[in-house]
């Protein structure tokens, strides 16, 4: 199911790539910088601190088409290749509250099923739908990377 949940969002999606390839696209800095933000946004490697190790903080700077930037921050909570990644994230690093994002990857006959959940405290349903749409554009690019 892709949609709104009681406390956030869920995206359920298939990839024509192995769980190892999808997991690598999530956890390799060079791949993450290519897909995080979709096609219209860049994430320069020199603005990215992203090593997927449990307990390690991460940060990224997105450069929008108009030149403005968004700073992202979080922490890796669980890193279990190639099946599970749990991390926190926020686009307001000065605020202590972080959303928890969980990615679960399951092998299928066609490749991999991704089930991603994100807590969205304080979001309206309209904001949650916008978050789903945004993640889908990110995952379109991740799919191209993972599927090679």
Which residues does each predicted region cover?
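Hydrophobic ligand-binding cavity/cleft-lining segments
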Residues: 1-42
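Alpha-helical scaffold segments that form or flank carboxylate-/histidine-based iron centers
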Residues: 17-18, 101, 130
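A conserved amphipathic terminal alpha-helix motif
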Residues: 119-148
